[in-house]
Amino acid sequence: MFQLLSFLLSGEATAVERIITDACPVYAPFFGAMGVTAALVFTVMGAAYGTAKASVGISNMGVMKPDLVIKAFIPVIFAGVIAIYGLIICVILVGGIKPNANYTLMKSFTDLGAGLTVGLCGLAAGMAIGIVGDSGVRAFGQQPKLYVIMMLILIFSEALGLYGLIIGILLSSVSDTYCPGQALVPLNSGNVIGKN
C-alpha cells in the first residue's frame, strides 16, 4: 500500500499501471476458465468410467439373474451424481469470472484450484464407484446378502467426490476482488487523478 501511495504522489502513471496490471492482469480469467473446464472434464470422465465399468458387471449379472438388474443399477446412479458435482462447481465458478471487472490473479488461481479439486476428486470417486460397482454387482448376483456391503462401499466411494465438492465450494468463496488503484484513471498527460 505504501508503494502504491508513493507512486501516486510522484505522478508516475506507468508504475501505477504496472501495479494494477500485476494484481489484475488481463489473462486472469483464463485461469478461472481452466478451473471450470477441469472440473467438468474430470468429473465427467470419472462418471463415464464408473458408469461403463459398473454397467459391464450389471450386464453380466443380468444374464443369470435378470430379476436383480434394477437393484443392481444403483452404482450407475452413484456414478452419474459425480458429474452433477462437477456441474455444480462449474455454475458457481462461472458466476464469479468477470473479464471486464475486477478479477484478481489470486481469485483466478483459487478458482483453478477449486476446479481441479472437484475434478480430480470426482475422477477418483468415479473410478472407485466403477470398480466397486462391477465387482459388487457380480458378487451380489451370486450372494444377495452382499448387497448392503456393496452399498456401504459405494457410499464411501461417493463421499470422495463430495469431499472435493465441499473444498471446491470453500475455495471458490474466497473473495479477493480488490485491484490496487481500481479507482484511479490515468490522464493523457501522464498525471494520475483520484476517484471518478
Swiss-Prot record:
Membrane-spanning residues: 26-46, 73-93, 112-132, 151-171
Citing just one GO molecular function, the answer is: proton-transporting ATPase activity, rotational mechanism
* Any one GO CC term of the record: contractile vacuolar membrane
Cytoplasmic compartment residues: 47-72, 133-150
- What Pfam families does the database record attribute to this sequence? ATP-synt_C (PF00137)
Query: Which intervals lie on the Lumenal side per UniProt?
Result: 1-25, 94-111, 172-196
InterPro entries cross-referenced by the UniProt entry: ATPase_proteolipid_c-like_dom, ATPase_proteolipid_csu, ATPase_proteolipid_su_C_euk, F/V-ATP_Csub_sf
Localization per Swiss-Prot or TrEMBL: Vacuole membrane
Site (Essential for proton translocation) location in chain: 158
Write out the entry's keywords from A to Z. Answer: Hydrogen ion transport, Ion transport, Membrane, Transmembrane, Transmembrane helix, Transport, Vacuole
Check the record and name the NCBIfam families matching this protein.
V_ATP_synt_C
Q: Could you give the subunit structure recorded for this chain?
A: V-ATPase is a heteromultimeric enzyme composed of a peripheral catalytic V1 complex (main components: subunits A, B, C, D, E, and F) attached to an integral membrane V0 proton pore complex (main component: the proteolipid protein; which is present as a hexamer that forms the proton-conducting pore).
Any idea what job this protein has?
Proton-conducting pore forming subunit of the membrane integral V0 complex of vacuolar ATPase. V-ATPase is responsible for acidifying a variety of intracellular compartments in eukaryotic cells.
Instruction: Name it.
Output: V-type proton ATPase proteolipid subunit
According to the entry, what is the taxonomic lineage of the organism? Eukaryota, Amoebozoa, Evosea, Eumycetozoa, Dictyostelia
